[in-house]
Structures are given as C-alpha cells and as structure tokens.
A protein has these predicted regions:
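N-terminal accessory segments that position/regulate proteins before the catalytic core
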Residues: 1-36, 40, 59, 66-69, ...
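C-terminal helix-cap and adjacent tail motif
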Residues: 2-4, 8, 15, 20, ...
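Small-aliphatic-rich amphipathic alpha-helix that forms the alpha element of a beta-alpha
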Residues: 37-42, 117-176
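Glycine-rich, charged/polar anion/phosphate-binding loops
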Residues: 40, 100-104, 174-177, 197-199
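Glycine-rich phosphate/pyrophosphate-binding beta-alpha loops
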Residues: 44-50
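Short, surface-exposed beta-edge/turn micro-motifs
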Residues: 52-53, 113-116, 187
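Glycine/small-residue-rich phosphate/adenosyl-binding loop
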Residues: 57-143
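A glycine-rich helix N-cap at a beta->alpha junction
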Residues: 76-88, 178-202
C-alpha cells in the first residue's frame, strides 16, 4: 500500500480557501503553470470515463473585461439580496461582514486577476432529464470534481483561486466573447493568481461528529456504530 504524508495532504485539503482580497494582481501567471493544474484536473473521476470537461483559460484583458462585466451584472442583485437578508438577521456579525467585503472586492477587480479559468462541460444537465438513477446528480458529479482538483493543484503551486458562478446568468454573452458553443455548459469562473502572504489557516467549521450520522439520519453519536 502506498504511504502518503497525511500531515501535508491534510494541510493542502484544509487550507485551500476561497481567495479574493489576497489575489496578487501584479504578477503574471505562466501558462505552463496553469496547464499543470489542468493536467491534474483531468485525473478527477468522471462517470463512464466520458471526460466531458473542457477548460477555457482567459488571460486576454479585453475578454477578461467581458467576463467581469457579466459577473458584476449578476453580482449586483445577488449581493443586494444577501445584504438585506443579513441586515434582518445578523447585521453585526463580523465574519459575515468580512465575507461581504471580500466578495465586493472581487467583483470590483475581477478583470485585473491574471487568469480567469472557465471550466466547461460538453452537453447540458438537461441531457439527463428523464434519466433513471439520479442522472442529474451524476452529470454534475462527473465534472465538478475536476474543478476542485484544479483548485487544489493551484494551491499546491502557490496560486489562489475562488469558485464563482455569478457570471453564469449571462453565460451566453460570455460564451459569445469566448467562442463557446451553445452545446457546451459553463460551470464556473475560477479567478487564479499568485496569493499575497505566506499561507492560509483552517476555516471555522462544525465538528465532524455533529454532521456525521451513523446508520440513520441525525444519529450523530460517534459511539453509535
């Protein structure tokens, strides 16, 4: 059996954060480095080994601006609704305010990020309508692991990323600018850059014991096996 350095692997898995304010906008990211991340992503599991994922890597300033403007158009109504909801429930929560601030920042500077990676998939979730056996979940489950693998590979190479989807409301506009056919589904936009600072720390999460159920829903006692 292969042996891995679990401390190093767990550190990678638990400190791959959504990076916004710490993206280094001043450093060019070599295409070879991005391609290395894509190579890693192609080893992600995919149902039937269909390998329907495709990557459109955007480093052209004019095309990045198209994506950023679509993102801001999608972001505005989303963040307004979020801020209203927060103000009614937890208006003074510093963690929430920090997230809102970093989200605002990313929307403002998105076109300045060195690389915007657009993961795509051939076909559409609609292709699975009427499919027996959880076809819709299988469709997404066959493409999204590759995106996460890309983000982990980027983190291991000193790059920061963030998973964003708000440009998708205007995916046709972006698709036209990037030459993406209508038969291809855009999955996300992953801004990619070197990050500022030394490292990242673990996020605040609920204990595994509280969210793990043994043999029946909401039986969360770890001794319940």
């Amino acid at each position: 059996m292969e042996e891995f350095n679990l401390d190093e692997i767990d550190h990678l898995l638990t400190t791959t954060r959504a990076v916004r304010k710490r993206l280094d906008l001043s450093r060019t990211v070599p295409r070879e480095l991005i391609l290395d991340c894509v190579k890693v992503s192609t080893q992600a599991p995919a149902g039937g080994n269909y390998q329907k994922w495709r990557w459109v890597i955007v480093d052209d300033p004019e095309k990045k601006l198209v994506i950023a403007e679509a993102y801001r158009d999608g972001y505005a109504p989303y963040i307004d609704a979020q801020k209203e909801a927060v103000s009614n429930k937890i208006p003074d929560d510093p963690t929430v305010q920090k997230i809102m601030s970093s989200s605002d920042y990313l929307a403002e500077i998105l076109e300045k990020v060195p690389v915007l990676a657009i993961p795509c998939s051939l076909g559409s979730p609609a292709d699975m309508e009427g499919d027996l056996g959880g076809g819709l979940q299988g469709w997404w489950g066959s493409v999204l692991p590759a995106v996460w693998s890309y983000m982990l590979a980027a983190r291991a190479r000193g790059l920061g990323t963030a998973w964003t989807t708000l440009h998708l409301r205007y995916s046709e506009r972006v698709g036209e600018a990037l030459g993406i056919p209508s038969t291809v589904t855009q999955l996300a936009c992953v801004p990619t850059a070197y990050y500022l600072g030394e490292t990242f720390k673990l996020g605040k999460r609920k204990p595994a014991e509280e969210i793990t159920y043994w043999n029946t829903w909401k039986q969360s006692s770890i001794e319940g096996s």
